[in-house]
């Protein structure tokens, strides 16, 4: 097993901020709607991010496990069967005509087929998936390191974040702007365990788990692991994208930095 040096982020927050949270939020149902409270919480999130970055080297690995540790059942949550017409068309053909678009602040925009991605250098890792809801599962993932794709696209100097646009729409509105999206900083994009997974437990990724491609960013919580990835974009800021918080759940109040 490798990379067992990691930080329990939720434990850190609980120890460092429990008293302050109780004093600020106890008995006040709508206090979190106040702008000044939002600023305090945003500052706490940034403090957590900076502290964890200081304690962990950029290349510190999430713990990896053996095949004997694999969960008997890996829970599928969030979207498990997207009904968007374009996605259903790809499912029907086994993703034969699907291509991953890579653009934004890159010198060489890409359009990569499933077979082209599978032909790239790959990484296999057995890691634990920690959900913000409190459950965890251990699974085996194989995919192309995100760094390989980004290097092929040749990021421009002003690129700071990588954004992932997905096929699923949790609101079922039929509006593309409501589809799932996520973003990570370059330090996480280039982490050796950050991969675009196309296999799970030695099988081609199933629809329920994000086929054809799912992001694995192993040092963060599960909602950062975007499923059904259709397009990747390199950007210099995330504040101008949709709700301005950098992700589907983040726009609804979750923390953008979900390190564990």
Question: Each PLM stretch: what is its role?
Answer:
Residues 1-7, 11, 18-26:
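N-terminal secretory signal peptides
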Residues 12-13, 102:
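Short low-polarity hydrophobic stretches
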Residues 15-18, 152:
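Residues within well-ordered alpha-helical secondary structure of globular protein domains
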Residues 31-260:
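Structured, non-membrane catalytic/scaffold regions adjacent to prosthetic-group chemistry
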């Amino acid at each position: 097993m490798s990379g067992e040096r990691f930080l329990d982020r939720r434990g850190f927050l609980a120890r460092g901020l429990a008293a302050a949270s109780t004093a600020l939020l106890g008995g006040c149902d709508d206090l979190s709607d106040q702008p000044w409270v939002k600023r305090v919480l945003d500052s706490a999130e940034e403090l957590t991010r900076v502290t964890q970055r200081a304690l962990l080297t950029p290349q510190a690995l999430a713990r990896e496990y053996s095949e004997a540790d694999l969960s008997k059942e890996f829970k599928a949550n969030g979207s498990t069967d997207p009904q968007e017409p374009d996605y259903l068309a790809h499912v029907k053909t086994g993703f034969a005509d699907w291509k991953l678009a890579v653009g934004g602040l890159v010198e060489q925009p890409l359009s990569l087929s499933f077979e082209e991605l599978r032909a790239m250098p790959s990484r296999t890792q057995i890691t634990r998936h920690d959900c913000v809801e409190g459950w965890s599962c251990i699974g085996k993932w194989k995919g192309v390191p995100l760094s390989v794709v980004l290097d092929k696209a040749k990021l421009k100097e002003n690129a700071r974040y990588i954004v992932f646009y997905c096929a699923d729409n949790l609101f079922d509105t039929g509006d593309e702007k409501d589809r799932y999206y996520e973003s990570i900083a370059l330090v996480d994009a280039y982490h050796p365990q950050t991969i675009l997974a196309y296999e799970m437990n030695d099988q081609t990724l199933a629809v329920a788990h994000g086929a054809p491609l799912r992001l694995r960013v192993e040092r963060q919580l599960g909602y950062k692991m975007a499923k059904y990835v259709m397009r990747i974009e390199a950007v210099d800021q995330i504040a101008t994208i949709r709700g301005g918080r950098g992700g589907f759940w983040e726009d609804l109040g979750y923390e953008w930095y979900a390190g564990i």
